[in-house]
Amino acid sequence: MDDWRSTISTQERSQFVTELAQILADMSRINGGEKANFNLEKLKKSAEQFESSLYASCNSKDLYLDAMRKRIAAMDSAKRKSIEAQRQKLAQAQAQAQAVQRQQQQQQQQHHMQQQGSGQQQANGIPANINAQMFLNQQAQARQQAQRQIRSTLTGQQQQQPMPQQPQPQQQQPNMMRPQLTLQQQQQLANELKVTEIPRELLQKIPNLPPGITTWPQITFWAQKNRPSQNDLIITKKVYQLHQQLLNKSKLQQSNVNRMNTSVQQPGMGVQQSPNQRMNMNQVPQQQQQVRQQQQQQQQQQQQQHKQQPQHQEPPAVLGRLNQVFTQAEQKMLYEAGKKMIENLQRSGKLPPNLDSQQQLLYIKKYMNQMVLKKMQQLGIPIPMPGSAQQQSQLLQQQQQQQQQQQQQQRQQQIPQVQQAPLQQPQVQPPQSQQAQSRRQAMGMKPTPVIPNAGVMKPQPQQTPQNIQQPMMQQQSSPPPQQQQQQQQQSKISVPRPTEQDMLALKKLNAEVTKNPVKLNDITNRLTNDQKQQIRSKLHANQQLFSSVESFIPTLYMLTRNEEHIRQLLQIRMLTREIMEKAVRGVFLVEPNVVDKVIFRYQKYYEYTKEQLLRRQQQLMTMRQMQNNNPNLTANDLLNQQQLLQNRKLNLAMQSQTQEPPQIAAQQQQPQQPISGVNNNSNMGIVLDSSLNATSRSGTNTMEFLNSPEFSAISPAVPSPNKDKKNPATRAVKGKKNSQSGIPTSNPQSNSNASVVNSRTATPTVIPGSSPMFNNKSLASGQQNSPSPKTMINSPPQQDNPYKNDELALKKMAIRTAELMSRYKHRKEVFVMSSIDLFLSTFADCLDIKDDAVDLVHKTPQPILDQINGTGKKKLSKAAQKARDQDPVEISVRNNKLLMPSKSEKTLRSFKIPIADITACFKPFADPKQLILNSTPKHDEKKRKFDDLEISPTDSSSELMSESKKVKFDSPDDMFLNDPSSVQETKPLVPSELGMYSINSKPSIPSSAGNMPAPNESTDSGMNIWDWNYWESL
């Protein structure tokens, strides 16, 4: 087996190792940026370890090369993705820098406006250097913050070094308090601590920390797993507090900048304003200022979230896959560990001591989500990326909100600019609002008060279109969210809601299924690595399908009202869960073909449920259209019209079927007879539980469409009064392939002998009009028969299958061939000591003589008889019993007769062949009744009647003695035979009582006896019946 390793040279292996190490080094440079710290030798060692493990584990050269190439390609694609991510980060950083520049330009414009009005502020007794100093401080902090954000975006780390806060000038107003973080900012700070990467300077202070851990949740998990010392925990706690302080300082700086912005945007009024105007401006409510501050804080927080999003995305929500990764016992352990974690955090003061049950449950869910995510990473399960469609829509909404807030901020900034403009400057035209106020003052009227959030004031008539066109374009480009929600609701399919009775019935069925779990054996050692990988990949690829079908179980019960269907689906679900739970641990219970069959069943259930929901929606839409076309119609009129249409469809389908007219008339005369279910062919579903066979349910209902290859062209079936017979022979022939998997399954082939009879289960009562499936009590029986796709109400009429008869003939031929082979095998086993019984029994089948009319010539040995009839003391093994159950015939020996009736047909099957085929073996004869052969004459016990001196070999003639030993007795070449001319006796092949000629009668046609050569013509081969040429010459 190691010959293939000699074909790979060390140079090729070293080349693979070099490629892997180079890719790892490139990825380290890309992710680390300028401060990337990696050792090429270590990377090369890790690449060598991977290559050596792969070299030792592979079974062939092709597997080794394929796995190595796939690994290199995957790493290369990951490198390309990292490069693309870095490009996006650079583009975002450039965009942020441009935004900061635009903001600085706006602030410079404001500063220019402030300098123009500084002389007037000094006239009022306000020092001019206050606003200038605040503006300079703001500019410096904005530059530092922009540089810090660009540097953190390029290096992949955020806020590695705390920037020193600029000292506040002593000339600020005395009433400005030291800014504090709000409750919302504190909560946001705690959330950022969970997802923000820890700077390398802080990580290096934590002792014994393995590489690759960069966040606090990872450190918490590592500490719970490795149990560090108390000294290490104290150092880690100090590092955590230091990291928290750094983030707190950055938040305080941001709040400082926000407060400065608000103070800059509220300058004093000019000297030439009247006292009333100054009073009105001083009487602006403080609520307006607080609203502006909150809006600016929210805007900056959202910008920071957007900046952090490409680097630190929130972990994806994978808690729904908890059952797929952990068992029930492990889930309980995780729950207890989450409780202990909350207690430890409360003791250390990181969480408040008085948490209610909902808050505790939220923290436990987050902890379990982290554990599921890590487990999925360890097992190699694909993890859904957080950039889903919902998050993209949220990002778009946030961007729209940002744009709206920016526009509001610009409008709010324009208000103080207009108020700051001196009225005596000839270069700037006065606003219309101020002109109106001056006119009212001249007329002795009161000035209009300033209304908070009153809208955008018009500084100039030329600027009006620019301020209005932007929100108008945004409103036209993005539809309102209410219309989008309505469109989404219209596109969704309406699902009927189960009642309390339905849920109770489902719980009862689930309890019945869980009482009898499926017992599967561990076949991990019998599977190859490729088969195991196939099972894993198939289970991972169809997880969404499994969860979708499980969520459809109540809906399926609402549509079918059949407990047997739901019971089988619950069995499949229980089987799938067990297979997936064990496969995650590396234990495999079934083969890949069984997984394919389970997936096939899930797909059929999903397609069936989806199709029925679509039909239900179409039915509701037709009813609405009819009501819209004729609003005077009542609900009963709509139901009656719909029933007429459905009856016409059913009549067309019934006319296309080949049924007896009295049966059709009887069905049409009793339209209100309730039929509770459908009994389809039972040999098509999976027998997942051995308890089902033990209980011997008669009339087990299964979905016929699960095995139908023409599922896409489903049409309603017409009820047939004849019950469909089970076909165990077909199940035995088609189920042999899966005998080793531990689950007897059936091949998914269509069964066209489906019939419609009353179901064993009782149908729950349904309120009339609650569902389109059951609109009125006067529905025809054909409409209430079956929930399957072939008997739905609004199904199109069935089209005749032109190949139906051919398919039935092929099925019967296959069953007949299987029975014929089984009969031949049993005859070889029973008649192992009796060749004549083997010939006569086979010949009786050719002549259409039944088994009960053929007596055996030799008595069957007692051990064989006990084994066949099952009368012996030794019981059959499981394998023998399984083979007997799958046998298409039932074998027994009764009254010295071998009986082998068919399991698929009660009547005895005919294996007769034409008489011409029998006589073809004997060409000169037209009828086997006239076939007469020369039998071997009877001889005495002592055959040596000749003189010993004449024919007996002497002592010296050893050659004669050796030749005589080779001669067979009773053969034509035996020298010790009587004279063949003395006794000439013929015997017919068939007894005379059957119409054959007797021994003394002459045949009507020349027989072989009449054409016999003379006795002295011993050299003629015409008499040698042992020679095949004799039969060929006839």
Swiss-Prot record:
Q: Name the segments for region: Disordered.
A: 101-124, 138-183, 281-315, 413-497, 655-682, 712-804, 951-1020
Q: Does the keyword Transcription regulation apply?
A: yes
Subcellular localization, as worded in the UniProt entry: Nucleus
| Keyword entries, A-Z | Activator, Nucleus, Transcription, Transcription regulation
Q: List the Gene3D superfamilies hit by this protein, alphabetically.
A: Coactivator CBP, KIX domain
Task: Establish whether keyword Transcription regulation is in the entry.
Answer: yes
TM region positions: none
Its family remark reads:
Belongs to the Mediator complex subunit 15 family.
Q: What is this protein called?
A: Mediator of RNA polymerase II transcription subunit 15
- Source organism: Kluyveromyces lactis (strain ATCC 8585 / CBS 2359 / DSM 70799 / NBRC 1267 / NRRL Y-1140 / WM37)
